[in-house]
Amino acid sequence: MYAVAIVLAALVALGATVIGTRAARNGRSATSKPPPKTKKREAVPRTPLPQEVRGVHVTMALASLPGKLDHYLSIPGLTALELDVKDENGEVGFLMPATSLARKVGASKPYYRARAVAAKARAKGVYLIGRVVVFEDPMLTASRPDLAIQTGGGAVWRNNAGLGWANPYDKRVWDYVLSAAKAAARAGFDEIQFDYVRFPSDGPIESAVFPGKTAEAPAWTIARFVHYATTQLKPLGVRVSLDVFGLSATRDLGVGQKPGRLAKYVDALSPMVYPSHYNPGEFDLTDPSASPGRTVAFSLRDFNNALLGRKAVLIPWLEDFSLTSDRRPPEEVQAQIDAARRSNARGFLLWNPSGVYTEELLK
């Protein structure tokens, strides 16, 4: 026993690990220094969700113009601003790392500096939402047709506007989209809002080929993407929301959007209840566009029913534009806002493709 003790003592002196000691259980020698602690990333400051969201949408191109973003952030009464992070052209509004796929396919553009924009919005007390277009992506599909919805001959399938769409069944597409969303979250955006989170709604859909397609219903594929996206983004401290079609609350539009199912995973749902987009006779209205307040009220009634028991709040997109004239009269925009408020929405977001808004209605 005395000899064994001498051997053990010698081994310990030489720095060997003795079985049964704490050092052995930790996988290091008794005399080695403890491994350095992993430095935690400092939490990114966030602006809380406003009591009433009163917001507008801004394109990345507009944000690149001198003084334009400052103007939007200074609109009296504005509490939220949605800025394109990844748009329907497939462009990402800021520079991603040089090794990223977005840079390799030419999608990453220096329209704005994400951290600087987030800091500016935070200083103004404005809640910053990053819009991320998901599956419509002509830029990615042009460079990577293997990630696209395809034709029978293997070419990139295109919708009626001639735009390619990424394949919703391909997880590589999911991760590509989320790379931009995560970058915006880390830069300080308060919320990521997914748009075009669906299958195509127009074009020669009957000829579309989806590599890797399963027997799973499209609505479950979209739900799986949304669930996956939230598990990736929530640890970064951002809220997550979705844009959905205005009629998706009561109808299967064939694009995979089921609001009641999707609302299980996100913080907010933003239905696009644009009165000009409803056909005559919808909600028993001869001309829904001519009755904007009633159209929004009927639409949000259906969404409130679809979201019963869900945690997601309702923040609709309203129409501050017109398909038949340059501008929609202010009283018609106000009628939509009033309808949203009566429907117990958590606020509203105004959409105008040209970025010109009826600013006095945000007060």
Put a short name on every predicted segment.
Residues P48-A63, A119, F135-R186:
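Active-site-adjacent "subsite" loops/lids of carbohydrate-active enzymes
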Residues R54-L62, P97-Y111, A161-D175, G212-W220, ...:
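The substrate-binding groove and active-site-proximal loops of carbohydrate-active enzymes
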Residues V56-A61, Y127-D137, Q193-F194, P200, ...:
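Aromatic-lined carbohydrate-recognition surfaces of secreted/lumenal glycan-active proteins
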Residues L62-P76, A102-G125, A219-H227, F298:
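Aromatic- and glycine-enriched glycan-recognition loops and surfaces
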Residues G67-V92, A183-Q193, K264-A268, A340-F348:
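Catalytic domains of carbohydrate-active enzymes, especially glycoside hydrolases
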Residues A80-E82, G106, Y112-W157, Q193-F194:
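Glycine-rich, aromatic-flanked loop segments that form ligand/cofactor-binding clefts
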Residues F94-V105, D137-N160, D202-K213:
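Aromatic- and acidic-residue-enriched segments that line the glycan-binding/catalytic groove
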Residues V266-P280, P288-K363:
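Substrate-binding cleft of secreted/luminal carbohydrate-active enzymes
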